[in-house]
Amino acid sequence: MKKIFVVYAHYSDESFNASIKTTFIETAKEKGHEIDCVDLYKEKFDPIFSGEKPDDVVLDHQRRIDKSDTIVLIAPIWNFRMPAIMEGWIDKVLAP
């Protein structure tokens, strides 16, 4: 059994990405894995990084990652890139 941290970045609960998230989580749980999921849009995550010290949200996500075995990112690709909210999350949470 693994603990999986899922980071989801799509604004619509009716999107193809929402279906991917739901199916992934249901299947992983059926296989005995533990899921911890954040929805960046519902959480209103601030993706702008200006070199400041991590805020409480960033520190919380980092702690949750430390307790996980795997990270899964679920987001659309728009113009060959992930949405800014996901890219900002990567910069703020995973950056040194």
Regions found by a protein language model. Give the residues of each.
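N-terminal beta1-alpha1-beta2 submodule of the flavodoxin-like/Rossmannoid cofactor-binding fold
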Residues: 1-96
